[in-house]
A protein has these predicted regions:
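Cationic, low-complexity basic patches in intrinsically disordered or flexible, solvent-exposed regions
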Residues: 5
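Glycine-rich phosphate- or other oxyanion-binding loops that anchor nucleotides, phosphorylated ligands
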Residues: 26-207
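Short, positively charged and aromatic/hydrophobic N-terminal segments
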Residues: 9-15
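Extreme N-terminal starter segment of soluble prokaryotic enzymes
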Residues: 16-21
Length: 207
């Protein structure tokens, strides 16, 4: 997203009780989130998500106590509903080749401690909208859901030492109808996502 848009959001942020920063990729996904929740809308994709969140955290006078990324995800296994992610990785980055080149481990995956009562899932993140059966089948061997920002958000949060939670709602089946399904699902699912976010916020405030 344009840097000036991020700066404007930064200037107007007001933290809630437990200093949670909420992050979504699009305005549509965040449409029903309460207006007093501190929110960054990053734009779609790994690069935009990384840039927007890093810029905010680097400039913040005080870091949030937790980052919650929420939004839609494609289903790789036919599941539906809202999930909390317990493991996320970047599916379009071949870390094994890098390991061979440098001769040492090059991790590509982050385990995330869960904090909600939602069902859990593994998430595959990449800079491509999954809508073909071959890619879907390949990713389904490692994850139940796929998106385009989750790993970037978790990676930046880890770098800054901030606990991170990923909440994802299934919007499509990552097949040849995914693009059309996603557009409809964003509007329909915004209310459900907002409800899950409010419930999680209340739970974290009681901890």
């Amino acid at each position: 997203m344009p840097a000036q848009h991020v700066n404007k959001i930064i200037d107007t942020l007001v933290y809630n009780e437990t200093m949670i920063l909420y992050v979504s990729a699009t305005q549509g996904e965040a449409a029903q989130v309460p207006s007093d929740y501190p929110l960054i809308v990053t734009g779609i994709g790994i690069i935009r998500a990384t840039l927007a969140l890093t810029e905010y955290l680097a400039r913040a006078d005080e870091l949030p106590e937790r980052i919650i990324n929420f939004g839609t995800a494609g289903s790789l296994s036919g599941n539906t509903g809202i999930f909390e992610i317990d493991h996320v990785f970047q599916h379009d980055f071949d870390h094994k080749v890098i390991e061979q080149i440098i001769g040492k481990p090059f991790p590509n995956g982050i385990d995330l401690p869960t904090v909600s009562t939602l069902p859990t899932a593994h998430l595959a993140t990449g800079d491509s909208f999954i809508n073909d059966p071959d890619t879907r089948a390949r990713l389904a061997q490692q994850a139940q859901l796929c998106d385009m920002e989750g790993y970037a958000i978790a990676f930046v949060a880890q770098h800054f030492g901030i606990p991170c939670t990923l909440i994802k709602q299934v919007s499509d089946n990552a097949d040849d109808a995914a693009a059309d399904t996603w557009v409809d699902a964003v509007d329909r699912g915004a209310q459900d996502l907002a409800g899950a976010i409010r419930t999680l916020n209340q739970r974290l405030n009681r901890l």
